[in-house]
Amino acid sequence: MARPTGKKFDKRRQQQNPLFKRKKFCRFTAAGVEQIDYKDTETLKDFIGENGKITPARLTGTKAHYQRQLDTAIKRARFLALLPYTDQHKA
């Protein structure tokens, strides 16, 4: 049997799924940021997972241009001990 498709089915599925998340957007584009600063640790912490890994752009909605800057900024902050490498280190 064929699966139902179309807008009507999509709306019904979204209403039934309690885990449906709103559309992702790039926070840096919305804020008009040109460069991501490695010294802004509060912003960088939002993009680091619970175990210390950098969260991928497909989960955060960050554009590729800013994701590259974000990766570099997090790595610089880690090197300078502004951010921990893993969850076992205290920040």
From Swiss-Prot:
A GO CC annotation recorded here is:
cytosolic small ribosomal subunit
In its UniProt record, which GO terms are filed under biological process?
Answer: translation
The record's annotation in SUPFAM superfamilies points to: Ribosomal protein S18
Q: Which GO terms describe its molecular function?
A: small ribosomal subunit rRNA binding; structural constituent of ribosome
Taxonomically, which superkingdom?
Bacteria
Keywords of this protein's UniProt record, alphabetized?
A: Ribonucleoprotein, Ribosomal protein, RNA-binding, rRNA-binding
> Per UniProt, what is one Pfam family of this protein?
Ribosomal_S18
> What family is this protein classified in?
Belongs to the bacterial ribosomal protein bS18 family.
UniProt-listed NCBIfam families: S18 (TIGR00165)
Q: How does it assemble?
A: Part of the 30S ribosomal subunit. Forms a tight heterodimer with protein bS6.
Q: What does this protein do?
A: Binds as a heterodimer with protein bS6 to the central domain of the 16S rRNA, where it helps stabilize the platform of the 30S subunit.
Give the HAMAP family listed for this entry. Ribosomal_bS18
Q: What is this protein called?
A: Small ribosomal subunit protein bS18
Native species: Burkholderia multivorans (strain ATCC 17616 / 249)
